Amino acid sequence: MTDVRIDQTAQPTGTSYRQARRSGMPMNACKKRPTIFPWPPVLLVTAVIAGLVLGHNAPYEITFPMARPSGLALIVTGLLIDIWAMAALRKARTTIWPNRSSSHLVVNGPFSYTRNPIYISNVMLLLGAGLLLGNFWFIPLAVIDAVLTYFLAIRREEKHLNANFGYKYEAYCRAVRRWI
């Protein structure tokens, strides 16, 4: 576990000069909300539907003996991480929605291990579903989900958090990895 020594209840403070200079959008836009559309949950649901449709129309089975137990373990672990992350966000009284403005910088719970525990759990859920169902299509869809989540959500969320929390967020980024 990474020891993150940052004010656990950091309130928005402003922007760093470096972030303001690098950003391609006005800082006020970043400060209000990271994005207009809640991409990550939509991407997850779309990937599940695509995996089921592809598995039905073009079956490509996973047949190794431990696939189902491994898939179940990934799903349970992913759900537990999701619940833990959402509980940490709720405890800090900030939003769980990726398109809403964050009122607090959450650095405890699963956020002390990774800056994006919910998105990691989404990937785990997709991989677990593929293994549990014996459907190979979920594996490339999990990778696609992670890449699209990065480009459509994470980059903007990072700008939003930096615009709102400045040096505290930069210190958090130095202490905790984006993924794992």
Task: Show which residues each predicted segment covers.
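Solvent-exposed interhelical
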Residues: F111
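Extended, alpha-helix-rich binding/interface surfaces that flank or overlap catalytic cores
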Residues: N116
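Membrane-anchoring alpha-helices and their flanking helix-loop junctions
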Residues: T2-N108, I120-I180
